[in-house]
């Protein structure tokens, strides 16, 4: 059993704004990996998107970066990867992870996804091909109900359909490897599994969404304003209010 030299774990997102659930997700994965692999370097990064084709962008890249920096200022194991921000949108996770695979060929890559994201992989650019580049670490969201027991079968079906659609255009792709997504039951099972594996965590992500924070932070209802404030790192909340981010048009 060969230990990886380094494990690189990243959580991507628009982070508009970053909130406490984001931080709890990446912190949980980092600490689980530290327990599973105490003698391996674990590098955890937040990967802000340049602009999602599936979302509008209320703030600038610089403002999002400043909020991220404030949010992780006292989190020593966490840093920001600006790879996607250095590219012109649209930028796709498939291309970013392809670059990471070339940049770090000997490292174990893990891409963290919430349940809401993994259930929309069919809408992502070459979404199901991400498994050919990385392992996925999936975290459930309580508001969405239980993850399907047939997730492996569903992924397998989609991967087969995707392979049939692309095989003529990419004859050199390793179809066999790409069509064997395998759900593992422990982070330790990631040893020697550099791609194609999915770990479905039992850690329940707090039910916080950036879109709700944007809608509630200036709400006329005190309860919603308080919920928005309590969902954010205090420094990020102050930054948003100071710069009047997400303020409704007058």
Task: Name each model-derived stretch.
Residues 1-250:
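Nucleotidyltransferase catalytic core that binds NTPs
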């Amino acid at each position: 059993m060969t230990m990886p030299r380094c494990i690189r774990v990243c959580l991507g997102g628009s982070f508009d704004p970053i909130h406490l659930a984001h931080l709890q997700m990446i912190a949980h994965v980092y600490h689980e990996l530290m327990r599973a692999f105490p003698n391996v370097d674990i590098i955890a990064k937040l990967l802000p998107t340049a602009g999602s084709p599936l979302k509008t962008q209320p703030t600038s890249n610089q403002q999002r970066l400043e909020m991220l920096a404030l949010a992780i200022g006292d989190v020593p194991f966490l840093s920001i990867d600006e790879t996607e921000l250095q590219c012109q949108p649209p930028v796709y996770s498939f291309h970013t992870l392809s670059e990471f695979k070339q940049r770090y060929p000997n490292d174990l890559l893990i891409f963290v996804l919430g349940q809401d994201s993994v259930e929309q992989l069919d809408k992502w650019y070459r979404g199901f091909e991400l498994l050919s580049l990385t392992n996925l670490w999936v975290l459930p969201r309580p508001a969405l109900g239980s993850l399907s027991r047939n997730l492996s079968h569903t992924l397998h079906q989609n991967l087969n359909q995707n392979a049939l659609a692309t095989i003529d255009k990419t004859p050199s792709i390793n179809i066999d490897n790409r069509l064997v997504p395998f759900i593992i039951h422990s982070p330790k099972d990631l040893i020697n599994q550099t791609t194609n594996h999915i770990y479905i965590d039992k850690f329940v992500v707090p039910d916080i969404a950036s879109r709700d924070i944007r809608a509630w932070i200036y709400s006329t209802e005190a309860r919603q304003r308080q919920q928005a404030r309590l969902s954010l790192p205090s420094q990020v909340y102050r930054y948003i209010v100071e710069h009047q981010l997400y303020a409704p048009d007058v």
